[in-house]
C-alpha cells in the first residue's frame, strides 16, 4: 500500500511540475521582452490565426505592463482572438470587461461593433446550414442583443468607420426579429390558437412594418379573425391587404399552414 501511495504521489508531483513548466514556458521566453515586442509578437500570432498563443501573449503583456496603452488594446485584441476562435462566451466576457474598465476609451466604437459581430454570427448551427434557413430562425435573444450593440454604436458614434456596416446589419436584424415573431404566429395558427396568432400578427404589423413579413401577417390576421367569428375585423384586414399588397397571392387563396416548410415551426 505504501508503495502504491508513493507511486501515486510521485506521479502527481511530476505531473504538477510538467504543468508548471508548460504554463511558465511563455513567461520565461518573454521575460526580457519590451511591451512593444510582446505586442508585436502577439499581433503576429493573431494574424497567423494562432489564437490561443496570441491570447497567452496578450495576457502576459497585460499582467506585466498593466498601465500601458498596449495593455488596454490587448484586452480588445483578446476579445477579437476569442471571436475568431469561435469562443463566443469568452469573447463577450472580454468585451464586457473592457467596457467596464475603460468606458471612455477612444476605441469604444470598435468594442460595441465587435460585441454586435459576436452576437450577429451566433447560432450558426448544423441544421441552420443544412436547411439553408434564414435569419428569422435564429435565437431572438441573440438578435435583440446584437441589434442593441449596433444601435448603441450608431447613436454614440455616428461618424465611426464601423457605423455604416452596423446600420446595414441592424436592417437585417430588424427583419430577423420580425421573422422570429412570424415563426411564432405560424406555429399558433397551425395549432389552432387563433387569438395568440392574431396577437403576433398585429405585433409584426405594428412593430416591424418595414419587413417582408407584413403581407403574410395580414393574411394570417384575416384568417384568424374568420376563425374567431369576427367577420367585420376580417373584412377590415382584407381591405388593408388589398390596398398595400394588390398583387398578393393571399387575395386569391387564404393563408395555409401546408405552404410552410416543415422546419419553420422549430424554435
Curated annotation (Swiss-Prot):
Keywords: Cell outer membrane, Competence, Lipoprotein, Membrane, Palmitate, Signal. A lipid is attached at residue 17 (S-diacylglycerol cysteine). A lipid is attached at residue 17 (N-palmitoyl cysteine). Residues 1-16 form the signal peptide. Part of the outer membrane protein assembly complex, which is involved in assembly and insertion of beta-barrel proteins into the outer membrane. Required for efficient transformation of Neisseria meningitidis by species-related DNA. It holds the Pfam family YfiO. It comes from the Bacteria. One of its GO terms (biological process) is Gram-negative-bacterium-type cell outer membrane assembly. Its main location: membrane. Belongs to the BamD family. This is Outer membrane protein assembly factor BamD. CDD domains: BamD. It comes from Neisseria meningitidis serogroup B (strain ATCC BAA-335 / MC58). Part of the Bam complex. Transmembrane segments: none annotated. It is a lipid-anchor. It is found in: Cell outer membrane. GO terms for cellular component: Bam protein complex. InterPro entries: BamD (IPR017689), BamD-like (IPR039565), TPR-like_helical_dom_sf (IPR011990). Present in outer membrane vesicle formulations which are used as vaccines in human.
